[in-house]
Amino acid sequence: NTVYSSTGNNYQAAVVTAQNILREYPYTKRREDLSILILRAKYDMAKESVPEKKEDRMRETIDEYYAFINEFPESKYKSEVERIFKDASKFVKDEEN
């Protein structure tokens, strides 16, 4: 959570920082926490995006959800990631109609 907080509203920097940590330390005990941070940051960035980029970023959030839930099917964050997935999916579905 420190990485996320220290970057303020710069969601992309939070994503890149967390991804770099995971790349450098793939077996860290904090892997799940860093992964939820990436998902949250992508979701928050998508929500605050300009309309032209919002749908693509929601789709990226959905992709990140699948990666997360595949790696951590019994995550302590499961209800949160399910809520994010539902919201992002609803947005994409509404955009398609």
Model-assigned labels for residue ranges:
Residues N1-N97:
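Acidic, polar-rich low-complexity tracts and alpha-helical solenoid repeat scaffolds
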